[in-house]
């Protein structure tokens, strides 16, 4: 399909740039160890390659289009599991990464992720821009404290997985579909409101933890302006999360009184996994000191 081709070409191009960075460094220094890059052009190429693989702005062009062209199950894998390999490389090579470029991309990603999601009606594209914004927060702290990157990744995967599982359970591909999700599963729809607020970063929910820790780390390292811009950009993301929450839980799609409530007649489905994933997605804030050890 078109989405598959876009994903393959983008990842192949990024892998080629990554290999070229390693080759360039080996040519000038004589070592093939990618974690010890000392050649400046190779460091820049490595940063750009990993940014393209992750979908950081301005190299995020492929992510919304790819997610829009694939099923929700596959979109879940691409936004979570497929981020592990490039972020592992980012963690291992954080000493060789070009800090100003990565920090700039981090700020751009939070802004683009917020702005891009404002006018979207497709849930997959909204989750794509949400992913771009979250990755921007991760990128901004990578060269300062890579351990915070891992905490952020862990929480991001939990929250995004839960959100996609809820969308899959209610078969919601557009915001319009969310208006009828209450007929499929009222409890799931009610919990989706809290989960979306967590993704938006509202305290006292889990999503507040990475934003709080990252802003604290940036301020400690005298990057107050960067922290301010990123905190303001979080309001953009929060707006479209609120819009989805309002549509899904506080509005009712026009129906007749004879309309059947699907949840009464649907066979009982197992929501144990969603329930187990939902708990850490909204209740990890009190455990923050333990995560920071």
Name each model-derived stretch.
Residues 1-293:
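Core, highly hydrophobic multi-pass alpha-helical transmembrane subunits of bioenergetic inner membranes
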